[in-house]
Amino acid sequence: MYTDTRQWTLVINSGQATRIRLICFPQAGAAAEQLRVWSNSLADHIELVVINLPGHGPRRDEAPYDNWPSLLQNTFAALDPWLGEPHALFGHGLGALLAYETCKYAQERFPRQTRHLFVSGCRSPDSLPRRPLLHSLPIEAFREAILTLGASPLEMPRGQSDLQSYERLLRNGLKLFETWYDTSSGSLDIPLTAFYGSEDPLATAKHMLNWREFTGREFELIEVAGNHFFIKSQRQRLLQVINTHLGLLAEHRI
């Protein structure tokens, strides 16, 4: 299988020597460009690599994946060039599930290269999604539910055609998010940090706490103020934690 990786990643570094990469997976409906600002606050030794899935950003004309096997197969193929060197993984919402699956893949394919997994705003692999399932809601109920989670009306597309395209993309991502399930507890040998929003109904403390069952290494659960979109409002808090962990790794000569 051949995967053209040229548009899969947004890569930003400080120009200084890279000691570790932070590979990020945005939430459902979000393009890689939305995490570009992270590079301004990351330590100079960390190279930022953000995944851009089909249907998002510069790939908006491509059909998004609607099933997990194809999504994972092509994501892994695109990331192979980056996974063979020291890296950490971060994902929010749907992105956290992709980060977790990539972590399992990299642990087998590139042993000892994944140094940390950060999951954010995402239920543990063995937790069932809350009902009703968002991706199956009628259009008006779907729009209301997204706004209730904390999405800003100002950030929603204004034109009717663009709004409908965005909603299809978001609904597709939420379907992947809500139909995924995994019971392979203890499968990781990698430190894991889990972030959750104090007012996020999609990923409560109970949902997030069970992530501890999926690693045999250190586990850290961190509450941050905000709703499901705390990845924006609490960006500096997240990056403070990430910089601390990846800074300690650099001090120990990765």
Could you say what each language-model-derived stretch is?
Residues 1-90, 97-254:
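Domain-scale detector for complete catalytic domains at protein termini or as standalone homologs
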